[in-house]
From Swiss-Prot:
It comes from the Eukaryota. This is Transmembrane protein 216. Part of the tectonic-like complex (also named B9 complex). Interacts with TMEM107. Its main location: membrane. It is found in: Membrane; Cytoplasm, Cytoskeleton, Cilium basal body. The chain crosses the membrane at residues 15-35, 49-69, 82-102, 115-135. The keyword Transmembrane helix applies. PANTHER family: GEO07735P1-RELATED-RELATED, TRANSMEMBRANE PROTEIN 216.
């Protein structure tokens, strides 16, 4: 743990977590509406639609847990929760990549939304690694 007079938490990382939390909530609701649109108006195979919606629900769980551990690790200056968040960044980025590239139908709106999610994942991963390095360097002093 860091000395009491040192604050090592990353403010830019915390801002990204906050913004990503709100963005992901909006993304999730829009994606549900898009799946409703696809299911009603496009010849979307039922099995694929169900699979994509179930994967979206799993993605919601992964993202909520990732943001929770990232925020707690950053604010409490703990390496373990921040490390869990780093580990969950990879499945999160893979899910965003799936929705960007591998769905049956990818709308332009989805491509834009998933590109923004990938930008958030990459930025957060970079800042998480820098923050973990800062926490580790202060443990040695």
């Amino acid at each position: 743990m860091a000395p009491r007079d040192k604050r090592l938490s990353s403010t830019p990382l915390e801002i990204l977590f906050f913004l990503n939390g709100w963005y992901y909530a909006t993304y999730f609701l829009l994606e549900l509406l898009i799946f409703l649109y696809k299911g009603l108006l496009l010849p979307y195979p039922t099995a694929n639609l169900v699979l994509d919606v179930v994967m979206l629900l799993l993605y919601l769980g992964i993202e909520v847990i990732r943001l929770f551990f990232g925020t707690k690790g950053n604010l409490c200056q703990r390496k373990m929760p921040l490390g869990i968040s780093v580990a969950l960044t990879f499945p999160s980025a893979m899910m965003a990549s799936y929705y960007l590239l591998l769905q049956t139908y990818v709308l332009r709106l989805e491509a834009i939304m998933n590109s923004i999610l990938l930008f958030f994942c990459g930025s957060e991963l970079l800042l998480e690694m820098l923050t973990l390095a800062t926490f580790s360097s202060m443990d040695r002093i």
